[in-house]
Amino acid sequence: MRQQELIQKLLAGADLSAQEMEACIDSIMENRFTDAGTGAILALLQKKGVTPTEAIGAYENLMTRVTPITLPAHAVDTCGTGGDHRGTFNISTAAAFIAAGAGVPIAKHGNRSITSKCGSADVLEALGYRVDLPASATEEQFRETGFAFLFAPLYHPSMKAVASIRRELGIRTLFNLLGPLINPAKVKRQFIGVFDPSVMELYADVLIHAGCQHAMIVHGKTEHGDGLDEASVSGPTTIIELFEGRLCHHTVNPEDFGLNRWSIDELAGGDAETNAQIIRQILDGSATQAQIDAALFASAITCYVSGMGSCIDEGMSMSKESLESLAAMENMNRIIEVNNRLAEECNTHEG
């Protein structure tokens, strides 16, 4: 479909088929559309609202473009969509280290900050972790530690084609929507926090299409009723659970799992150094109880999604043991040590 034809169709409010969307993304990534045309298409899709069928078409095209990496499909990705503007610390990153300390294999896909002060890549770097390892070294990192961070720009080089257009538009687009769904390792277990509850069903549809085995898609509320892309310790959390092709809907509260309810202000983060310090304090037990509870809740869900915990309650027990035994802290230190060694080896080989 030609650029002008596509724009006219979207202006009329019409939806695209999966094949049309796949062809559209192909034309965008191969620079067959003008920058103005691509910007118009992305803005019109955002205004209309992306359908599950359109998201699946875009997903299919983007996954053909990833830099390949081979990690076990049973590894778990923990991530959020961002965009809630609540300024919390990096809860899903802290949770990933707690779950890893409990033996859960982690393949976390992430990026630098887009809508917050500090993205997962930023806080990992502040902890001393090198996010720029090539795929082969990242595979070795996972073999040695059961943990890998997949830095989005390294695995989605085709995104450079739209980087300046997205920056100039200054709005969330289809690419922000798909970010949490396009883990290059094609993991089959995911814990995803979304700030906009209207996309939860869409995420479930794409994950079913992708063959995801077990996923928890969550949307939390603060005590003021504002949305969070986290499991909330400040209010209720709505969950869509996907397990082997079947969907279940739940609403849970922190008290259901023995956690206290805290004000969202208690979970405030800052820049990368501040958030790295919060994560260290959570893992060594010196953080506030609010910070610990938020990380425990996310880790408990991660343990459950991994299949190592039979329910969130069991995941909570695993997570508390990981923290209280200092396994999470010791494991994080080892992960960073191995990561730094592999980075040095890469530098030596390049030199």
UniProtKB/Swiss-Prot annotation:
EC number: 2.4.2.18
Catalytic activity: N-(5-phospho-beta-D-ribosyl)anthranilate + diphosphate = 5-phospho-alpha-D-ribose 1-diphosphate + anthranilate
Keyword Amino-acid biosynthesis: yes
Coiled-coil regions listed in the entry: none
Residue numbers binding Mg(2+) 2: 229-230
Binding site residues for anthranilate 2: 166
Cofactor: Mg(2+)
Keywords associated with the record: Amino-acid biosynthesis, Aromatic amino acid biosynthesis, Glycosyltransferase, Magnesium, Metal-binding, Transferase, Tryptophan biosynthesis
UniProt GO BP: L-tryptophan biosynthetic process
Enzyme class per UniProt: transferase
Keyword Transferase among record annotations: yes
Record-listed Mg(2+) 1 binding positions: 92, 230
Pfam family, one: Glycos_trans_3N
UniProt pathway annotation: Amino-acid biosynthesis; L-tryptophan biosynthesis; L-tryptophan from chorismate: step 2/5
Subunit structure comment from the entry: Homodimer.
Name of this chain's protein: Anthranilate phosphoribosyltransferase
This protein's encoding gene: trpD
